[in-house]
């Protein structure tokens, strides 16, 4: 027998029935668990339910449910217990989790966000675009140059996640983070006309697979930053839209060893730093050792740091973000951008065109 239960009912059930629960204390006051414990376990729970259930040896149903007891036995949840689990489910403001009882056994699932392909959480298909007049995907503004070209990707997840408004808007429970600095508004009517399907999860997230995992930028109706800067407006003139903020100017006309910094504009200083970084990187490549290449790159990076660095900063920042970003979407886009920069012919062309000049610099050192 299946019985869907909300968080309050689950807590009552666990306290009043045979369902395993933490024994009530005889003390009159409850110990308040630190919030960071809740956050830690909540993130770990999301990871297991969405991505790593099979890797952890758990049996996951096609609808995403996993036995609660088997989760509590995992090392990463040692010390959590049923009481804290129920508190996490009840207190999650984004309603990420649902629990149900099946013949006396408790199960839990994530409502959306899975990367496990075999999982198909039941969702309501949206057949009329008028029911979702606003569909917005939140991300980081640093990713716009990539997204503007390739569109939105579901990455390793099963769907692209959107919301019906911005964080804090009435009725918006989940689907967009407070930390987002870029908002991409989707023309759902146009997309649906082309056969793109949209779904609504149990906690109100708007989901789509796009076409083969990608939602083309042609379905973007408006893109703006959290500061109000408009990067794209489908109703505006194309020349007013900024799909790529990369510099198109030629840095070759600037002397990379110029000391007259006062005569250079900020734009020229940025291009000059790019050449410094390229020189450092190229020096290492010519010497033929990756260790020296890194040293050479660092040397170029240091030279350029006082000039408003561009290429060195871009690559260094991307590498750093790969260590701190946990979201699949962000990581995959960053990897693609980093690969694009590192695998492009820019460094090779630079070395080929300036080989003698670079070798001369190396010999002088």
From Swiss-Prot:
It is an enzyme of class 2 (transferase). The keyword tRNA processing applies. It comes from the Eukaryota. GO terms for cellular component: nucleus. Residues 17-27 have a biased composition (Low complexity). It catalyses: 2'-phospho-[ligated tRNA] + NAD(+) = mature tRNA + ADP-alpha-D-ribose 1'',2''-cyclic phosphate + nicotinamide. Keywords: NAD, Transferase, tRNA processing. The keyword ATP-binding does not apply. GO terms for molecular function: tRNA 2'-phosphotransferase activity. Catalyzes the last step of tRNA splicing, the transfer of the splice junction 2'-phosphate from ligated tRNA to NAD to produce ADP-ribose 1''-2'' cyclic phosphate. Belongs to the KptA/TPT1 family. This is Putative tRNA 2'-phosphotransferase.
């Amino acid at each position: 027998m299946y019985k869907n239960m909300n968080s309050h009912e689950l807590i009552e059930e666990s306290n009043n029935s045979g369902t395993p629960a933490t024994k009530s204390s005889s003390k009159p006051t409850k110990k308040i668990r630190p919030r960071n414990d809740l956050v830690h376990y909540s993130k770990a729970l999301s990871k297991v339910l969405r991505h790593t259930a099979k890797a952890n040896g758990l049996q996951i149903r096609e609808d995403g449910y996993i036995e609660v007891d088997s989760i509590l036995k995992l090392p990463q949840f040692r010390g959590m217990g049923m009481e804290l689990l129920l508190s996490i489910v009840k207190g999650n403001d984004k309603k990420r989790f649902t629990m149900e009882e099946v013949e006396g056994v408790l199960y839990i699932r994530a409502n959306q966000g899975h990367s496990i392909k075999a999982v198909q959480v039941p969702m309501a298909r949206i057949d009329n675009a008028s029911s979702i007049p606003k569909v917005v995907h939140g991300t980081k503004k640093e990713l716009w140059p990539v997204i503007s070209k390739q569109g939105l990707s579901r990455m390793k997840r099963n769907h692209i996640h959107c919301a019906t408004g911005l964080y804090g808007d009435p009725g918006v429970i989940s689907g967009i983070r407070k930390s987002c600095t870029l908002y991409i508004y989707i023309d759902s009517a146009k997309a649906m006309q082309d056969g793109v399907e949209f779904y609504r999860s149990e906690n109100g997230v708007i989901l789509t697979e796009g076409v083969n995992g990608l939602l083309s930028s042609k379905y973007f109706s408006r893109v703006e930053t959290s500061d109000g800067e408009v990067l794209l407006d489908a109703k505006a003139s194309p020349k007013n839209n900024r799909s790529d903020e990369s510099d198109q100017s030629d840095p070759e006309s600037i002397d990379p060893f110029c000391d007259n910094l006062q005569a250079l504009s900020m734009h020229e200083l940025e291009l000059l730093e790019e050449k410094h970084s390229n020189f450092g990187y190229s020096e290492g490549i010519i010497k033929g050792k990756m260790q020296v290449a890194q040293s050479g790159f660092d040397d170029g990076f240091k030279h350029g740091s006082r000039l408003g660095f561009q290429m060195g900063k871009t690559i260094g920042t991307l590498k750093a973000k790969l260590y701190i970003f946990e979201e699949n979407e962000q990581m995959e886009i960053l990897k693609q951008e980093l690969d694009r920069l590192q695998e492009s012919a820019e460094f090779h062309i630079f070395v080929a065109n300036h080989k003698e000049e670079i070798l001369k610099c190396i010999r002088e050192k």
